């Protein structure tokens, strides 16, 4: 299982860095910050499927 540490999130602004991650919702997030903000918004129900585009 691949895990991303989202303990420092949410953040108000994410960088434009592009390092895509695929969430368990089959959505591609542009970077860890975008993904972790979504994880926080989902109350932890969203998980990482894999690194890279979905």
Swiss-Prot record:
Record-given protein name: Ovomucoid
Record text about domains: Avian ovomucoid consists of three homologous, tandem Kazal family inhibitory domains.
Intrachain disulfide bonds: 6-36, 14-33, 22-54
MF-aspect GO terms: serine-type endopeptidase inhibitor activity
Classification via PANTHER family: OVOMUCOID-LIKE-RELATED (PTHR47729:SF1), SERINE PEPTIDASE INHIBITOR, KAZAL TYPE 2, TANDEM DUPLICATE 1-RELATED (PTHR47729)
Annotated site (Reactive bond 3): 16-17
Kazal-like domain location: 4-54
Gene Ontology CC terms: extracellular region
Main location: secreted
Alphabetical UniProt keywords: Disulfide bond, Glycoprotein, Protease inhibitor, Repeat, Secreted, Serine protease inhibitor
Residues bearing glycans: 43
């Amino acid at each position: 299982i691949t895990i991303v540490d989202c303990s420092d999130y949410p953040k108000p602004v994410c960088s434009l860095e592009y390092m895509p991650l695929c969430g368990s919702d089959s959505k591609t997030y542009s970077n860890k910050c975008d993904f972790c903000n979504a994880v926080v918004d989902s109350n932890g129900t969203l998980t990482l499927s894999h690194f890279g585009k979905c």
